[in-house]
């Protein structure tokens, strides 16, 4: 039995106790009325009991609905907390990559963007560290990418990765770590939701 079912079960028990209490109150009131004026009181007692049952049922439904909303809210909060922690861990790992690992990652991101742009001349933008790394190993990059002219563009505020654009700047592929994480966030959310909540 999961947490949501336990909460709903507890709420059902509480609702049943309230129903019993309301019904007992109604029965006591009905008995007094019967003794005072039996003929008129019977009809009124029935009405009071019906009303009490209706009120009790409405109260039970309200409590259950509120509990379901609370369970859903808590579930979403837990999901958000886990997603945030996963994304923070991804950021931490990206920030602590060795230079060689990072270079391989940058090369892969460059390759992907250049292939998508399908251009022979591109401009690459990134943070200062990444542009310096690309500049220092440009021959290695060119040997892998083939006949592509790479111009180093301006520095941008990013934790890593690259932005690659056509020479005229009309088409741009944002392969920064932040942009990629944003693109995959929906997928990450969906995976976490499946793992946590089935």
From Swiss-Prot:
Pfam families registered for this protein in UniProt: vATP-synt_E
Transmembrane portions of the chain: none
SUPFAM superfamilies with a match to the protein in the record: F1F0 ATP synthase subunit B, membrane domain, V-type ATPase subunit E-like
GO cellular component: plasma membrane; proton-transporting two-sector ATPase complex, catalytic domain
Entry-linked Gene3D superfamilies: ATP synthase, E subunit, C-terminal (3.30.2320.30), F1F0 ATP synthase subunit B, membrane domain (1.20.5.620)
Protein topology in the membrane: Peripheral membrane protein
MF terms (GO), sorted A to Z: ATP binding; proton-transporting ATP synthase activity, rotational mechanism; proton-transporting ATPase activity, rotational mechanism
Swiss-Prot/TrEMBL keywords: ATP synthesis, Cell membrane, Hydrogen ion transport, Ion transport, Membrane, Transport
Cell compartments where the protein resides: Cell membrane
Family: Belongs to the V-ATPase E subunit family.
Protein name per Swiss-Prot or TrEMBL: A-type ATP synthase subunit E
Organism: Pyrococcus horikoshii (strain ATCC 700860 / DSM 12428 / JCM 9974 / NBRC 100139 / OT-3)
């Amino acid at each position: 039995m999961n947490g949501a079912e336990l909460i709903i079960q507890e709420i059902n028990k509480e609702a049943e106790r309230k129903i019993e209490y309301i019904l007992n109150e109604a029965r006591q009131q009905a008995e007094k009325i019967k003794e005072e004026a039996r003929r008129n009181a019977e009809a009124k007692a029935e009405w009071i009991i019906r009303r009490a049952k209706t009120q009790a049922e409405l109260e039970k439904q309200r409590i259950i609905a509120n509990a379901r909303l609370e369970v859903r809210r808590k579930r979403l909060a837990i999901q958000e907390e886990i997603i945030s922690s996963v994304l923070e861990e991804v950021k931490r790992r990206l920030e602590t990559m060795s230079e060689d690992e990072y270079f391989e990652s940058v090369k892969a991101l460059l390759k992907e963007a250049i292939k998508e742009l399908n251009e022979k001349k591109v401009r690459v933008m990134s943070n200062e560290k990444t542009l310096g790394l690309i500049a220092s190993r440009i021959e290695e990059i060119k040997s892998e990418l083939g006949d592509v002219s790479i111009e180093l563009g301006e520095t941008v505020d990013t934790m890593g990765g690259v932005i690659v654009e056509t020479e005229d700047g009309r088409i741009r592929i944002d392969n920064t770590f932040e942009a990629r994480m944003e693109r995959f966030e929906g997928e990450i959310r969906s995976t976490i939701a499946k793992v946590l909540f089935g």
